[in-house]
């Protein structure tokens, strides 16, 4: 039977869906719905009815409604505050589904929200304009009776209630929500206040409230009906987030197949209960194991304490390598007593901790690292000066000063073993390769009886001059382990000293890591690119290196991770740098600085023939006959295809030639030999990029050749000057010049202007002309005062229109009074003049002593003209006077 009615409706969010015949409550946020319920003054008659329409979002202008709503009997409505806004909590009993699609017309927002006059007022209050909804409602009592008959015939439903009761009792684990929305948590609350805030109920309170409402609303004797309504109420409490199947139950709810619905929920509950049982069992087992572990550890602690009183130590595992070493009379001397005590204490501390504790893992890692370090273990030196000299000569040509220093150190070691009476008492042999040096890790420096005078070197020179490979050769010559530590870009002090163990992911610094990697405390350490360390807010790593490189301090090096001193006094540290000026002064004061010269042409030829060519042949698996290169061709390659201080570029050129020959051999299997000559060189390498005879500039006014020095070695510097009229006059500088070089140009101009008559500049108006000074290769930054005399010469040449001979170059700082001050990098600048085939070089008189460090091969090709004042240069270049003093080498 169907009855047409005019009904009020309220809009509720879709995540608060409920089921027919159950009790529930919802939070009403939509303002029109609130105004509707306020007209009832929250007092409902028994025959009052409403419709709940579900919407995805009640705040948007175009509300999208679900096709299925609920026909309800309102029980109570109270005002609450929700997120600072007024809201209503509506308590109701759901009577039936309300299918919007069965209405006599299609439901849409415009029609529903339009005002319809309430003719059948089914709620108390003033008759007026309210939201209404028209449709057909099935006879609720008939549907309920049919469902109850189905329940009476199926006794299995009673078993379902016991299952569902278990689910309710475990609501925290399975999908029953006690605060699904703020309103749901306030289910059946009796005392509301206008300012009440929403509070969640626990599941026992909800069960009690549901039972009380069912008892009030139904005949208590109807036990089956009570259970049925309680079941449908529980359905409404299923949390959509934990039980997404609730949405399917709501949409597919079919009165004709209610048994299927119950079975689906029952299956879910049984699966959830089984899963919960398994999880609970695993947790219980884990907790039992932890409790068992705790009890055993406590017992072990008491036993260990008692054994300790008897002088017995049971904290160590016999399978531990460290324990085996302690039982060995020789190996136990490897560890200082203080370290053994720390390991023992930390091991005991670890044994008393729960292994699941985060701190336990930190303590374990710390102890393992202490055991891993070599401490007093060192490798035996090969005390053979002849062998060491052969190895050093094998890998490097030249570099006499470094080789001599290493041989001196080897001589000291031999002398110590021969004449020091205490030496044998301080060293315990392990095997033919390793020994224990008891002179390490002395508690007091005064206790030391053997001093090895271990060198700490700093090799400074251009790239490609063999600094890095030299350290490898030294380690092989002395039979020591080799460790490379790259310092380029390091800007955090903790990378050197390590991190404190309080930090997450703490680890030792690069130095201690290197010692652990080497496995001995007397390795050769290469500190590569020490001049490229940086500093920031995290500290200055160069300051940390002071302790490493100071022979007076490195016996007590402090690493933050170890929190113990480590003796680095037996380690040979070899630092490398490209530019002397970039090394902190404090570090320079602590090391022996050995400058490596750029290689001369003859040295490059020797290096190529003895080292590079054999290496290239081996790398590409060629026969020597297929890589036949005469010395003439090799010299041509060095002069015309490379321009460098070292030999890295030469190595790449030779690699390229070798690959070309390999291709020829693959294409011509019968090829037995191949000669690399000047005739086929262009075919193999292309056009030569450098043409030394044609590199000199044309002799035109305004150009002078200077000499410069950078991290890559020496280079020539052609300075150009041009003059043009302007209103303000002055000087214009281009070519990426830095401050010192700009000041040098300003000084040169001031000096020329103040001595204009002496230089033959009579009619030039400095105030109406701009002097533009340019230094080519503008992309390369340039700095330094040594171009002062070159600036002066170029300015005078431009203003007098007298050219400077292109076989002259110069270097020197100039003052406002014309004095020529000393400069640095004379050796590198001489190399640049040599490559440029410049015959005469002006140098400051104070730099004469530096000529001794320049290789004879270079000096023989250059005539040096030392000067004290600039006018000496002027007289030679512009007045054709012969120099009073020249220095030549035959």
Swiss-Prot record:
Induction: By heat shock. InterPro entries: AAA+_ATPase, ATPase_AAA_core, Lon_bac/euk-typ, Lon_lid, Lon_proteolytic, Lon_Prtase, P-loop_NTPase, Ribosomal_Su5_D2-typ_SF. Pfam families: AAA, Lon_C, Lon_lid. It catalyses: Hydrolysis of proteins in presence of ATP. ATP binds at residues 461-468. The keyword Plastid does not apply. PROSITE patterns: LON_PROTEOLYTIC (PS51786). It is found in: Cytoplasm. Gene3D superfamilies: 1.10.8.60, 1.20.5.5270, 1.20.58.1480, 3.30.230.10, P-loop containing nucleotide triphosphate hydrolases. GO terms for cellular component: cytoplasm. Residues 698-880 form the Lon proteolytic domain. It is an enzyme of class 3 (hydrolase). Keywords: ATP-binding, Cytoplasm, Hydrolase, Nucleotide-binding, Protease, Serine protease, Stress response. The active site is at residues 786, 829. Homohexamer. Organized in a ring with a central cavity. Belongs to the peptidase S16 family. NCBIfam families: lon. This is Lon protease. It comes from Mycoplasmopsis synoviae (strain 53). The gene is lon.
